[in-house]
């Protein structure tokens, strides 16, 4: 048995860019062996990170390739009994969640049938009743080419999922919507544990979060953190806020067996007083604001930031103010998620 960890980054993110995202930080910190179990990692650059940056970032045309690249790595490395851990930020989170849907639909192909990956993906893309996971065609495809049983995914960790949209073109709206509606991003029964860190303070209408709905048979936690999109997923120079979301995700994955290098853990330094950046700049100024609505637990660092009124947070954070108003300013009626300790 080994652990296979897949890391998919956000739009225009790549290893050579400034401060690393949380996805890249984790990918660099995976131990090759932890508790006598081999661990292998695959990092996939964000949509639009290659030479086709503009169109890839605007329309998400690279998302098909990202999903298939991640899936191909799994096919080439997987053996029965291996555990799968999937991580992603922004559109990379959308990619990771779509990858989970792809595996649910087509299984994991045996290595000798890796040439069938394009056919498997086309079947997944149909998103029709005839190509659903339980349809005769899908079942027959898996029996012919995939490992015998649909493999459970041990863990999916997402930071502020947005769909294939995300990047607006002024006066044209947002490109790429219809092309990517086929993706199955809902947590399916093959996912055992799912974690989603969501940004409270993001106001760009093109970055509305793709939230998960609770399902009784899945261990799902969706926790809200202070900050805008990249304050939660990382890449800003001031990592105080993003390190809260990173530390939480590390603790959750570690509790399920994933091991990290000491150097990666030692550099995580959460700070609830960290800088809250302004993401509504440039072309986004021409677009409307969209206040997010908090649904679910908030991280304990949010409460501390509010109580300390860091940089006037009590007047600036409208979603949290609305939540507090709805419960009569009674913190005991709000679910608070905390942190643990990682090795």
Where are these regions (language model features)?
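Active-site- or binding-pocket-proximal scaffold segments within functional domains
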Residues: 1-343
């Amino acid at each position: 048995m080994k652990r296979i960890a897949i890391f998919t980054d956000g739009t225009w993110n790549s290893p050579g860019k400034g401060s690393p995202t949380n996805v890249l930080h984790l990918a660099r910190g995976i131990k090759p062996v932890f508790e006598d179990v081999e661990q292998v990692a695959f990092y996939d650059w964000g949509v639009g990170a290659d030479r086709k940056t503009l169109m890839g970032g605007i329309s998400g045309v690279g998302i098909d390739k990202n999903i298939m690249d991640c899936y191909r790595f799994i096919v080439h490395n997987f053996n029965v009994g291996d555990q799968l851990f999937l991580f992603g930020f922004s559109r990379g989170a959308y990619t990771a969640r779509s990858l989970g849907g792809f595996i649910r639909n087509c299984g994991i192909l045996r290595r000798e049938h890796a040439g069938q990956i394009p056919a498997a993906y086309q079947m997944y893309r149909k998103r029709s009743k005839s190509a659903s996971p339980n349809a005769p065609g899908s079942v027959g495809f898996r029996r012919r080419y995939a490992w015998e049983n649909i493999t459970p995914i041990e863990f999916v960790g997402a930071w502020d999922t947005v769909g294939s949209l995300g990047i607006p073109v002024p006066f044209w709206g947002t490109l790429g919507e219809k092309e990517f509606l086929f993706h199955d991003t809902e947590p399916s029964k093959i996912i055992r544990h799912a974690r989603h860190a969501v940004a409270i303070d993001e106001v760009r209408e093109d970055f509305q979060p793709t939230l998960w709905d609770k399902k009784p048979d899945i261990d799902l936690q969706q926790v809200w953190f202070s900050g805008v999109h990249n304050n939660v997923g990382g890449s800003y120079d001031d990592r105080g806020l993003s390190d809260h979301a990173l530390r939480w995700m590390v603790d959750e994955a570690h509790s399920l067996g994933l091991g990290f290098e000491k150097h990666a853990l030692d550099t995580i330094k959460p700070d609830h007083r960290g800088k809250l950046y302004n993401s509504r700049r440039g072309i986004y100024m021409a677009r409307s604001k969209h206040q997010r609505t908090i649904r679910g637990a908030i991280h304990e660092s949010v409460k501390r930031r509010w109580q300390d009124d860091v940089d006037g947070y009590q007047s600036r954070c409208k979603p949290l103010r609305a939540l507090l108003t709805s419960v009569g300013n009674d913190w005991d009626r709000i679910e608070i998620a905390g942190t643990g300790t990682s090795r």
